[in-house]
Amino acid sequence: MATTRGKKTYPQLPPAPDDYPTFPDKSTWPVVFPEIPAGTNGRFARPPQHTSKAAAPKIPADQVPNHVAVVMDGNGRWATQRGLGRTEGHKMGEAVLIDITCGAIEIGIKHLTVYAFSTENWKRSTEEVRFLMGFNREVVRRRRENLNDMGVRMRWVGSRPRMWRSVIKEFDIAEQMTVDNDVITINYCVNYGGRTEIVEAARALAQEAVDGKINPARISEAMFAKHLHRADIPDVDLFIRTSGEQRASNFLLWQAAYAEYVFQDKLWPDYDRRDLWAACEEYVNRNRRFGRA
């Protein structure tokens, strides 16, 4: 529930009671999501607090990034550093994704988009590709009820060619289950590439022009945006990449045109909601000019 101080509104959830359930306990895999009290008075359930019991920093509503995009990088390196197979890093990243979802709700973010599998990832070994596709399917199946209880709206974003039908099926079920939720919208980018998205939009517009449905001279940015995978995804405010790498990697090229970039050194399996909050605090200190002086 948002609080008001003076003329400013703070959307952060208040600190949880000390005995409120915590997450994540990484001693087992899959990481177990704790039982949390059901929401009351038509509200959704409050997310479990972090195991550290840290609370989200107070940031005024007009300074909280509305849309945060995250490149979840470093799973393979995390596993290699520990003498494990790359897939073990991906497994440990599942709990981090759920944890930052909880943290995003606590701090007041309304849109979260995560890069789970790129169109370039098909170049990886057949074994890893098969694992990642199956893993995405199982994560959605395993976590959608927990996320639904917290008011999360789940959506898949990506290209259909080459995408496993079984993965699309699980996303479709999750989207139908959560379609009316309004606490936060999470876009899971699987088989997604920014250039591919733009090319597919251009192709659709070109076909409409050939069919005489539109005048090419009247094509605008707004018209183009309507042909992207999800026309209602807002522009990215904060773009986060973990693992210390500093590049966009073909992610949300159109939507992130004016995003603020924060690069954090932690590998994804070591990341948690406190790191997300730190990125939000850095975002607050940025001067967004949008081309103005």
Curated annotation (Swiss-Prot):
UniProt EC number: 2.5.1.86, 2.5.1.87
First-listed, main subcellular location of the protein, grouped into a coarse class: membrane
Residues the record lists as binding Mg(2+): 73, 260
Cofactor-binding details, from the entry: Binds 2 magnesium ions per subunit.
GO MF term set: ditrans,polycis-undecaprenyl-diphosphate synthase [(2E,6E)-farnesyl-diphosphate specific] activity; magnesium ion binding; manganese ion binding; Z-farnesyl diphosphate synthase activity
Sorted UniProt keywords: Cell membrane, Magnesium, Membrane, Metal-binding, Transferase
Catalytic activity: (2Z,6E)-farnesyl diphosphate + 7 isopentenyl diphosphate = (2Z,6Z,10Z,14Z,18Z,22Z,26Z,30Z,34E)-decaprenyl diphosphate + 7 diphosphate; n isopentenyl diphosphate + (2E,6E)-farnesyl diphosphate = a di-trans,poly-cis-polyprenyl diphosphate + n diphosphate
Cellular location(s): Cell membrane
Gene Ontology biological process terms, A to Z: polyprenol biosynthetic process
InterPro entries with a match to the protein in the record: UPP_synth-like (IPR001441), UPP_synth-like_CS (IPR018520), UPP_synth-like_sf (IPR036424)
Disordered: annotated span: 1-24
Binding site for substrate: 74-78, 86, 90, 118-120, 122, 124, 241, 247-249
GO cellular component: cytosol; plasma membrane
Residues annotated as the enzyme's active site: 73, 121
Annotated function: Catalyzes the sequential condensation of isopentenyl diphosphate (IPP) in the cis configuration with (2Z,6E)-farnesyl diphosphate (Z-FPP or EZ-FPP) generating the 50 carbon product trans,polycis-decaprenyl diphosphate. When (2E,6E)-farnesyl diphosphate (E-FPP or EE-FPP) is used in vitro, both primary products decaprenyl diphosphate and heptaprenyl diphosphate are synthesized. It is probably due to the fact that M.smegmatis synthesizes both (2E,6E,10E)-geranylgeranyl diphosphate (EEE-GGPP) and (2E,6E,10Z)-geranylgeranyl diphosphate (EEZ-GGPP).
Record text on subunit structure and interactions: Homodimer.
Name the UniProt record assigns to this protein: Decaprenyl diphosphate synthase
Organism: Mycolicibacterium smegmatis (strain ATCC 700084 / mc(2)155) (Mycobacterium smegmatis)
Lineage, broadest ranks: Bacteria, Bacillati, Actinomycetota, Actinomycetes, Mycobacteriales
Name of encoding gene: uppS
